[in-house]
Amino acid sequence: MPKRKAPAEGEAKEEPKRRSARLSAKPAPPKPEPKPKKAAPKKEKAANDKKEDKKAATKGKKGAKGKDETKQEDAKEENHSENGDTKTNEAPAAEASDDKEAKSE
């Protein structure tokens, strides 16, 4: 790369301009003030609230049914063993009572 030539002794070099003359000549335009948003009428909000209340009520009902269904499924799963034989909860209770009778004798 060629080296820069040293300026002559009598000449003063100006600093390079970063902005063009066109941009520096014009001041920045002022930003327009934002307009305030219009407030919605209260009547429309009340109508929307009623609709939301109805939606919430129906959602609650669906959720309760879903919980009941899962409880029933859990109960069914407890009654079935992995190999397909059914287990009864009464059998262990009967064995426990037999053990108590044997101990008392």
UniProtKB/Swiss-Prot annotation:
GO terms of molecular function: chromatin binding; nucleosomal DNA binding
One cellular-component annotation, GO: nucleus
Segments of this protein annotated with the region Disordered: 1-105
Keywords noted in UniProt: DNA-binding, Nucleus
Compositionally biased spans, kind Basic and acidic residues: 1-18, 32-56, 65-88
Domain of life according to the entry: Eukaryota
Presence of keyword Amino-acid biosynthesis: no
InterPro entries, sorted: HMGN_fam
One of the Pfam families matching this protein, by short name: HMG14_17
Gene Ontology biological process: chromatin organization
Places the protein is found: Nucleus
Record's keyword annotation contains Nucleus: yes
Function: Binds to the inner side of the nucleosomal DNA thus altering the interaction between the DNA and the histone octamer. May be involved in the process which maintains transcribable genes in a unique chromatin conformation.
Miscellaneous section: There are two HMG-14 proteins in chicken: HMG-14A the major component, and HMG-14B the minor component.
Family, similarity comment: Belongs to the HMGN family.
The protein, known as: Non-histone chromosomal protein HMG-14A
Species: Gallus gallus (Chicken)
